[in-house]
């Protein structure tokens, strides 16, 4: 009887912990979508410029999102698998916004490239209704990249993050003489501007899954592309592995660059940083809210990475009392 009670308690606890975690990659199929097409597909509002250029996805399977789907730029870089009633489907990346009156004001509307539209129906039809879609990871190669906007200087710069399999939730920066990361605000054109510049600074890129990639940049240089040290996970099962990937910070030597991607954009050679930090996967976020801490999953110990910070975790404080309450209730029921 006691064994059954303990097993039941553990099962309930596991269910509660799993239910409390919202997987950002679990997306349901949305019906009732529509699509049109347009031809001026380069230089969209999401900042990718030429689709086959150094910042673009490398193909023409793209979409301009209706105003409600676009979410003021938050969905830039998200990939969607769109299907029609005849089981034809196409996967597109959001690279632009569609704000025209009419179709673009619908809740779930895509203004597709001609190539993408033609997979779902003839262009002569003009408008396709009765479509469905689901959010999917983007099929990109290599690691996440970051570029500083043209016009960046010692008083202002703006970051463009691209080549990510999932969308970016937050970009934060701190100067070398600071211990505090400052979150930046995303613009409607998918850049992350800041006036915190001057000297070497560190950039922290957070995915929608709660992972972090760190980049150390020596100085402000317009249109310089940096390839980071990692790529984000695309499923919650990957995030919950016993030994999650550690994305170490990268330091770039601005004097050493690889072949130019174009006359304005260069990809520098990476040099490992002597000071490594770990990302905190999403399943740890319910335990730790501070980026300078990491939860040791197997040993269940708190590892302090910054002695100047204090942990405030309501979940850890309340969990023992909650478990004790459940145990008392079940013991009363069984005995």
Curated annotation (Swiss-Prot):
Membrane topology term: Single-pass type I membrane protein
Q: Which residues are glycosylated?
A: 87
Q: Which GO BP annotation is one of this protein's?
A: slug development involved in sorocarp development
- Name a single GO cellular component: membrane
Q: Quick one: signal sequence residues? A: 1-20
List where in the cell it is found: Membrane
Mention any Pfam family matching this sequence: DPBB_1
Q: Which GO terms describe its molecular function?
A: cellulose binding
The record places the following residue ranges in the Extracellular compartment, namely 21-314
Disulfide topology: 46-76, 79-138
Tell me which UniProt keywords the record has, alphabetically: Disulfide bond, Glycoprotein, Membrane, Signal, Transmembrane, Transmembrane helix
Q: Where is this region: Disordered?
A: 247-276
**Is the tRNA processing keyword given for this protein?**
no
What family, per the record?
Belongs to the expansin family. Expansin A subfamily.
Question: Its biological function?
Answer: May serve to lubricate the movement of the cellulose microfibrils during cell growth and wall extension and/or may serve to maintain the fluid state of the slug cell wall.
From the Swiss-Prot or TrEMBL record, give the protein name: Expansin-like protein 3
Q: Which organism is it from?
A: Dictyostelium discoideum (Social amoeba)
Q: What is the gene name?
A: expl3
